[in-house]
Amino acid sequence: MTRKLLILSGCLILALNSCKSDMETTPASSVDHTTTQLNGTTIHKLLINGAYTYVNEVNGEYFYADDITITAEQFNQLKRMANPDISTVERSTIVSSFIKTWPNATVYYTLPSQGSLSTQAYNTFLTNINKAFDMISSKTSVKFVQRTNQTEYITFTYSTGNSSPLGWVKNRVNGIKIYNTTYPAIIAHEIMHSMGIMHEQCRPDRDQYIIVDTNRAQDGTRHNFNLYNDYAGHGEFDFGSVMMYKSTDFAIDPNLPVMTKLDGSTFGKQRDGLSAGDYAGINHLYGPVNSTSATNGTYTLTTSLAGDKNIDITGSSTADGTDVILYSATTGNNQKFIFRKSEHGYFTIKSILDSTKVLTVRNNGTANGTAVELRTNADTDAQKWLLFNLGNEGFGFAPKNAPSLRLEVKDGLTTNLTPIVIGSTDQTLQPYTKQRFTLTKVN
């Protein structure tokens, strides 16, 4: 992170604090991706889905926000998203791979070395890292386990600022930098970025709750107000979230705040602990999607089209090839399913009628409108489903054999016996209502 949070003095120090006259415009590669220079920082401005996303590049490191770093691969994915000519298939693939959560809701870690810290300061740092772990895990399913030989894990370093990589990436070590070693909640804030959690003010529905005027933000800080359309906010907008910034953060003039409530009033921030909304969001993100097989439980899948219609196995039959349909909600086992992890991100969806039978794309089809059926589990790609956490909108499902398609209610109908199929989408970031489902745990 390029800033220090000095809680006691209330002072916000920015490394990027020069005036506009220091900016030098460089040739743009396209209207969808322009770059400017600011004191050794390359500011990338990307037009994605009609909104601008900013990424700051400093010495080959990419900052998605002041305290969020992304890999070169993730940055290149954003650049591809800024290309209006990419196919729906590629766009869908990018969305599904940009941010990943930790497998089995388990975050492996190593503790920092003492470095330049005094013995007392070092012991305080270690104590507060463990307090941050406890703060997160006390009311969630997430576990923090000290690393033995795992390839992916988080590390901590005392630094001049706070920052963390974004989410889990295969074969990557997430190096978390901490300046505020005496504040467990700030350490938790950065750990949550490594868990794949964004800032509250950047959720896609923020305009329903706050006004953001980035013209009031200091040069080089607009990336802190990116709208994360691929990030799903859960619950009501949470002004008390540990992931929320205050009105005047990054403001040129504190009397002209970057953010206000809709009525024009300002708000502060807290770094004392996680809010109830933070815990609810983590539990949704790391709920059935990332739980271990022992704790997945049994769920119903309700369409977002109608709260009283569930995915159903026709006639409660367990014969191979049985149609999967929409039907009025009941308490029958024909509407209950068990999620079992197949590989990271992918799950099989088993019928409680017969746990050897799973939801399957018929004949391994990849065409729009291909039916979904019940069939004996053969561990094929047509039986593995990538789950998209859509926050308040529930979940979306993409079959591994056809990753650009989504599980959907055919034609968006809500009549009984409507087939469940896989269908194309032009709205990979905001899926059609017919492609959204709520998972409700029934035991």
Curated annotation (Swiss-Prot):
Cofactor: how bound: Binds 1 zinc ion per subunit.
Domain Peptidase M12A: 92-289
Catalysis: reaction(s): Hydrolyzes polypeptides on the amino-side of Asp in -Xaa-|-Asp-. Acts very slowly on -Xaa-|-Glu
Required cofactor(s): Zn(2+)
Propeptide segment residues: 16-91
EC code: 3.4.24.76
Ricin B-type lectin domain span: 297-440
GO molecular function, one term: carbohydrate binding
The protein's role, per its UniProt record: Zinc metallendopeptidase that cleaves preferentially on N-terminal side of aspartate-containing substrates.
Protein known as: Flavastacin
